[in-house]
Amino acid sequence: MEVSGIDVSSHQGIIDWSKVQTDFVILRAGWSWYQGGMNIDKCFLENAQGVQKAGIPWGVYLYAYDKSPAAARIAAARLSDLLADYELAYPVYYDIEDTKYTKMSREDNTAIALAFLEAMQDHGHYAGLYTYTSFANSFLTMEKLAAYDLWIADYRSKMGYTGPGDVWMWQHTGTGGRTQGINGDVDQNLCYKDYPAIMRAAVPPVEQNPPTGIPDGWVPQAVVDKLQADYDALEAKHSDTLNRIMNIIQEA
């Protein structure tokens, strides 16, 4: 099977989900902290309500900044709390790609990712790993992560990752992808596994009652806004760098 979907964050701004035509959506739930915990994407609650109202199957991803396995486990617990009132049809992905990890060892990066994935699984969620091909090849020990479903970004004409593990979702472009109801570019993905059927078989139905506010104990809005601005700048820089690398590879 093959279905087409998108992934979005606050970078896309306000989305008119009634106009979006897609098979699935992966929402950014937020990003983790160096020492543990997480910040919620400022558009997550609205996006979650929007996709549910539109009847679009969805999952989430958490952008990683954790600097230790202990921090990753705390982030997983916070994310599990956030998702308690939702019924997901796609996995919870750990997005490990930030440049800070290129300065850390492969062993440390792998231990951090594994800690998050194991913790999410212990919390009862279907956990998966998101990264891009060269990061997986250079900064992770993929043999230790092969038990988890992979979502790989590779903007070449075909999936280039051939390492350990199964790639069930391919992010094949980050620019030029347009979807009605969303302003600007949006990441485009292909999925090769029937996650909704798996989720229906594994999880009893729960009443959908999205929370109306942010849980107590989260970071002040001013700090959230500053971190959001920093993240958006990093995301733009990463996308530009990745596109230039892919262009060089294609021209070689």
Regions found by a protein language model. Give the residues of each.
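Beta-rich nucleic-acid/ligand-interaction surfaces
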Residues: T131-L145
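Short, compositionally biased P/S/T/A/G/V-rich stretches that sit at domain boundaries
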Residues: T241-A252
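Functionally critical loop-and-helix segments that line ligand-binding/catalytic clefts
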Residues: M1-K19, D23, T141-D216
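Short amphipathic alpha-helical segments that mediate assembly, nucleic-acid/protein binding
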Residues: P220, H238-L242
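Short beta-strand/turn micro-motifs composed of small residues
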Residues: L62, T131, D154
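Flexible coil/loop interruptions and hinge/linker segments embedded within long fibrous stalks
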Residues: V219-V223, L227
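Substrate-binding cleft of extracellular glycoside hydrolase catalytic domains
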Residues: M1-L117, Q121-Y126
